Amino acid sequence: MSTGTYPYKMFKMDVTNLNKVEDVEIERLRAERELLRRQKEAAKNSSTNGSVNIEGTQDSNDLQYNAHLFKSSNPKEEYDSAIDVRNDISQDEDDYKRTNDVNDSYRLVRQYEAPKELLNEYADESYDPMQERQSKKQIQDRESDYQKQRYDRQLTPTRVDAFQPDGTQSNGRSYAEVMRQVELEKEERRVHMELNQRRREGTLKEVEEEESISDKKRELELNNTEISQKPKRSRWDQAPPSVTQVSTTKRRSRWDKAPENFTISEHVIENGISEDLINKEVNVVEEKLRPPVRLLTEEELNELLPSEGYAILEPPPGYLESIHPELLQKGTTLDTYHVPQEQELPLEKELPAALPTEIPGVGDLAFFKQEDVKYFGKLLKVEDEAKLTIAELRERKILRLLLKVKNGTPPMRKSALRQLTDQARDFGAAALFNQILPLLMERTLEDQERHLLVKVIDRILYKLDDLVRPFTHKILVVIEPLLIDEDYYARAEGREIISNLAKASGLAHMIATMRPDIDHVDEYVRNTTARAFSVVASALGVPALLPFLKAVCRSKKSWQARHTGVRIIQQIALLLGCSILPHLKNLVDCIGHGLEDEQQKVRIMTALSLSALAEAATPYGIEAFDSVLKPLWSGVQRHRGKSLAAFLKATGFIIPLMEPEYASHFTRRIMKILLREFNSPDEEMKKIVLKVVSQCASTDGVTPEYLRTDVLPEFFHCFWSRRMASDRRSYKQVVETTVVLAQQVGSRQIVERVVNNFKDESEPYRKMTAETVDKVIGSLGVSEIDERLEELLLDGVLFAFQEQSVEEKVILTCFSTVVNALGTRCKPYLPQIVSTILYRLNNKSANVREQAADLVSSITIVLKACGEEALMRKLGVVLYEYLGEEYPEVLGSILGAIKAIVSVVGMSSMQPPIRDLLPRLTPILRNRHEKVQENTIDLVGKIADRGSEYVSAREWMRICFELIDMLKAHKKSIRRAAVNTFGYISKAIGPQDVLATLLNNLKVQERQNRVCTTVAIAIVAETCMPFTVVPALMADYRTPEMNVQNGVLKSLAFMFEYIGEQARDYVYAITPLLADALMDRDAVHRQTAASVIKHLSLGCVGLGVEDAMIHLLNILWPNILEESPHVINAVREGIDGIRNCIGVGPIMAYLVQGLFHPSRKVRNTYWTSYNSAYVQSADAMVPYYPHVDDDQFNNYDMKTLHICI
């Protein structure tokens, strides 16, 4: 131990002795410790100065200080000789720890806390592995490197609209200029590749050496003509020496000119946008705000420094300035502090320290991010709009609306989106797209923001129509990446935008715009362009695009063009599906020659496109593929690797289209190649081989004997292995292929080969076996399974079920499928199965207990069929004892098992008795877990339906109170089960008490609870007859409370919907109530009353209550001019219901009055109802058309229509 440090040593002591130490003793110890610390410091200083060893003094002080704390005569015996580095140090061994105070003193009071193991356990439980994924909301965080190539594309300059009706052309690049630019890029790429190739080969070195030699000679000649001068290193604070140089003609560079009034919008209009353009405007502003370098004046120094206590000193003689004056005159920029001038202060105020959420002219936003400053920074500046030009005002208005859409609240977004849509043509296409498209190219964009901006483009495309033509390519650059997004809804949005764009621009303009990208040097651009062309074909029709596709696929200029053309046809097949059948022959002819193309990529893509066409056309269209069968077969024999995989895939999709004899012939020929490729090390090849085998095996021409002798042995040898089971995709394909083979050769051939795998030590292998057996036996049954195989099967499944350690339910599903398929044949094995279930119900693992309970639910029917009611009663008693389970998932499974046993055994034979079981279920209803709630309510409903007499009415009422809370559950199935259970209970104990409980529930504030209560009341009315409910509802309607009255009306609506024709008996009783509701000031009242009338009238069609319906129609009709969409829809439905009840004639008398009203809104309302009547009752309306007198020119009266047969 070093002499200059305090000896921190761990020692043992008794806690009781420490608790008995008096305060005085503690103070004495503190004083001694302080004295010891001072001695240590003095010793340290002396050892530093004179290197004196004071170890003996230190030990004596330790002995004097610690003597009363140890029972041993030698205190060092109690010391630990080493620091324990274990994680599980006990509390007694860790009594005293060093604190962080200055004195480095010991703690005098024990510190108690939970063990580290327990703390670590809770820490692990709180860890959420998906939290990092959820926090990454930006799109670029989940994109692959291939998808991120979209940031490398540029928004090209605006292109000329060659299809303007007036014949004039707008400013922009023509098609010829675009093609020249594309050719220039190709040539540049070719030169770079050639240079790299020569550099690798070493042929470029000699040219470089010759150039370097000539450069050196030129330098020597220049040096001879100039005055020899020793070079001197330049300093930043010295002016460069003046050297007279010969004026030479210098080429003017565009970088010599400083940008003026540079904005993103103007640059986008002229030259497009690149990745660095986003920050360019900000850099220009910073360049303008950067102050010139100058010396501080006396006034500025007086402001910075205090005036008192300071004196201005004269420079000493010989002082030289560190910054040369000539450098200052040249305006060199140095990072020095400066005092802002008055004209600079407003510019600094424009950049706020914190990001605001309330923007002038926009309002209070939901959020405002740092990235938004790049695009919406102009809105942060408060400017006088009277001094702005019309274009600047339009730009600021568009920015405000876009900011509302992007960052605003839902009402704000809705209003801004409507304004952008309505004023799209007023704003103009250039002003809109030059602000929207750069936003969509932002790297930090999130899914919700992109969705909203894409919605803006979708809306304004309808309004702009052909005005979008100059911006077609820009829109495609932004939208095409959506077509390869992993999100399905993003792909759907992209297809919708491109479809609308194609309809607005026209096919000719779309082809002219996308033609340069077909043979682009970048594969990413070609891929997205092909997908966009497929969307254009689906929008404008495949026949319109076929001539262009035929020319592209036969291009001799570029193999990239042929490759892209074939890919377009592949994407058309994937997008349109069976809709390609009318054009199948032409599409196959377009790409058929590609199977023999000189480029391998074109051949592969052609084969893949043919497979997509065949898959889309299944099971028709074999005639269209006649021309490609021979090239396909020769390619299968000739190619290897990826090319062979593509050709095999195409052949596999075409064979099922053939006639049985041809399919059998081709299958036998291709199966030899497939068997050879079974041993291929390539994973993709194996997947394709499996798919082709399943397709060939499912054809009609292939015999089971051929598959059994030639295919199955090699198939199981190569594919049924542990390595294949560990790969999820291969595992799934192997299972599907095995099931297809089983359907041809029978279940026994497959089960015999895989049954021994149930006892394999690899769990993924056992799981693959279980899934295969489950699907094979589930589809083919066990009629081919003999007794020995049956024994092996049950033994293997039971072993796999006992040995499983994963939470998946594959083996459980297989177990239940096998047991239910065997039926009574598995009776000898039931005691062993039940004993296994009972043993696993007592397992410490919650997952094991849950699966054991689920297995009980699935085999109860077999237990009943085998007559093992004693086993079921035993299981019921055991499960009843486990109703105190703490894990909700396990408890839900136990309740499901009890429900299955109750359904099979019956109420009278159930053990435990129903009178003991139901009271245990009442407190479980309070459990908020969805699985527990659903199974509990279903069980209670079964008991109420079949065994209500075993339980007292008081217990049923207690359950009713608990069920009321279930009416507001989030899951729909739980709410439905609760409502049905109310009907069973009301049927069991009478509707009075249940109805009173439900009517009281109408007074709560929660709307969902009230709606579910109204449905429950309707169920009670349907179960116990309406006359038991209608008087109570009509009496409760008198309650002067809005929620209660609305609830009563809604209950009547549901009730009349349920009871149908029984409503005829209550029409006249309920009419005054409905008349009062239709004349209420509350719109919701009138809406709900109109719904009641709809259901009431539809239930009384042809039952002779037309007078009451006409009375209700007279009160309902004035509401036809309501503006609320919900109210007007309910009113129209009520009118349609009355029309079906009383006929279309009286309704026509009402409708004719407003069909030709001067007001457009009135006409629209009446014509909507007229169109609905015309759709349903066109023939019945003819006699009720208004009579129009003839005039001198026209005869409106047709005599034949007056004839009634």
From Swiss-Prot:
Subcellular localization: Nucleus
Listed InterPro entries: ARM-like (IPR011989), ARM-type_fold (IPR016024), PP2A/SF3B1-like_HEAT (IPR054573), SF3b_su1 (IPR015016), SF3b_su1-like (IPR038737)
Record GO cellular component, one term: U2 snRNP
Organism domain of life: Eukaryota
Record field: compositional bias (Basic and acidic residues): 130-153
Region (Disordered) residue spans: 39-58, 122-175, 202-254
Main location as per UniProt: nucleus
HEAT repeat residue intervals: 393-429, 431-473, 475-505, 506-540, 541-578, 582-619, 665-702, 745-782, 828-865, 912-949, 954-991, 993-1024, 1025-1061, 1065-1102, 1107-1142, 1143-1179
Keywords recorded for this protein, A-Z: mRNA processing, mRNA splicing, Nucleus, Repeat, Spliceosome
GO biological process: mRNA cis splicing, via spliceosome; siRNA-mediated pericentric heterochromatin formation; spliceosomal complex assembly
One term of GO molecular function: mRNA binding
Biased composition (Polar residues): 44-58
Biological role: Contacts pre-mRNA on both sides of the branch site early in spliceosome assembly.
Subunit structure: Belongs to the 40S cdc5-associated complex (or cwf complex), a spliceosome sub-complex reminiscent of a late-stage spliceosome composed of the U2, U5 and U6 snRNAs and at least brr2, cdc5, cwf2/prp3, cwf3/syf1, cwf4/syf3, cwf5/ecm2, spp42/cwf6, cwf7/spf27, cwf8, cwf9, cwf10, cwf11, cwf12, prp45/cwf13, cwf14, cwf15, cwf16, cwf17, cwf18, cwf19, cwf20, cwf21, cwf22, cwf23, cwf24, cwf25, cwf26, cyp7/cwf27, cwf28, cwf29/ist3, lea1, msl1, prp5/cwf1, prp10, prp12/sap130, prp17, prp22, sap61, sap62, sap114, sap145, slu7, smb1, smd1, smd3, smf1, smg1 and syf2.
Family, similarity comment: Belongs to the SF3B1 family.
Protein name in the entry: U2 snRNP component prp10
The species this protein was found in: Schizosaccharomyces pombe (strain 972 / ATCC 24843) (Fission yeast)
